[in-house]
């Protein structure tokens, strides 16, 4: 076999499709998994799938949004309002970190965030980063799916951000409705002492628990019937499928302490977000 990448490329180009197929089929699963785990992207980030035209469409994931010949099934897709905050909270250009104190130091935590250096700048960076992610991952995708004839795409934006103050820093501003925060609500994982006593801000638990129950009800109804509707008991605001024009598009998931649960017709497009940025300059 090849001893380096150049030799491997040369060998691959000299082989027929059938020979490549036979080579892969002859390998043990462990060999294939080892090769995948050792693969590294040429730049940064994770190793990406590639559109081979067999497993993945030649047009990549984009083609799956617009190809009306594909089988369509109901989908739930969504993002979090403050998606980027978790990652940016680790960036020392935005947040000052310092020695942990008190019980946090006792349990072995050495450093903790202690100050957002420029709150307005931090909020702006996170708003646009999170909003453009929503635009790419949900809104543009959903619009393309509707055009291709897919009418059972249920979108959401998770907005809950009623977090506690830790080490003197308001977590609702530092983290907010950040990456993966919704997972706790989908699975109702509130029994942990740490979650109950350190996640929720003052007075936030009852409304947060109610929101979790609502989310689970929507998810369960979707699993049963392919549409979240009004939840299992039929007593929640109707979660409608994404639609075009000025109609309702996605469900905002927040607690009664703030906005509550409601449908929104505000679509995040590149033009909309760029216009906002010009207003703020």
Question: Which residues does each predicted region cover?
Answer:
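C-terminal beta-signal and terminal closure region of outer-membrane beta-barrel proteins
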Residues: 265-271
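Substrate-gating cap/lid region and adjacent catalytic-acid/histidine neighborhood
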Residues: 17-206
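Non-catalytic, well-ordered alpha-helical segments in soluble enzyme domains
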Residues: 207-230
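Mature extracytoplasmic/periplasmic domains
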Residues: 163, 225, 229-264
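Short, charged, surface-exposed loops that flank catalytic or proteolytic processing sites
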Residues: 2-22
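Conserved small/polar residues in nucleotide/adenosyl-binding loops
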Residues: 279-281
């Amino acid at each position: 076999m090849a001893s380096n990448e150049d030799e491997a490329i040369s060998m691959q180009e000299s082989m027929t499709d059938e020979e490549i197929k036979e080579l892969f089929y002859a390998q043990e699963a462990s060999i294939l998994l080892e090769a995948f785990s050792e693969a590294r992207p040429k730049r940064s980030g994770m190793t990406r799938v590639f559109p081979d035209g067999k497993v993945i469409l030649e047009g990549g994931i984009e083609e799956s949004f617009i190809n009306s010949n594909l089988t369509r099934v109901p989908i739930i897709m969504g993002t979090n309002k403050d998606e980027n905050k978790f990652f940016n909270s680790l960036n020392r250009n935005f947040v000052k970190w310092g020695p942990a104190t008190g019980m946090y130091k006792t349990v072995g935590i050495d450093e903790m965030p202690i100050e957002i250096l420029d709150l307005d700048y931090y909020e702006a960076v996170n708003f646009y980063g999170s909003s453009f992610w929503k635009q790419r991952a949900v809104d543009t995708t959903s619009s393309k799916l509707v055009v291709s004839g897919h009418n059972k795409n249920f979108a959401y934006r998770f907005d809950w951000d009623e977090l506690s103050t830790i080490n003197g820093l308001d977590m609702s501003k530092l983290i907010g409705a950040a990456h993966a925060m919704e997972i706790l609500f989908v699975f109702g994982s509130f029994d942990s002492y740490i979650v109950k006593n350190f996640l929720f801000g003052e007075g936030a638990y009852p409304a947060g628990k109610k929101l979790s129950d609502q989310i689970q009800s929507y998810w369960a109804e979707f699993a049963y019937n392919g549409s979240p509707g009004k939840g299992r008991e039929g007593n929640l605001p109707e979660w409608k499928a994404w639609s075009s024009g000025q109609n309702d598009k996605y469900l905002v998931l927040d607690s009664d302490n703030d906005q509550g649960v409601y449908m929104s017709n505000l679509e995040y497009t590149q033009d909309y977000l760029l216009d906002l940025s010009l207003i703020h300059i």
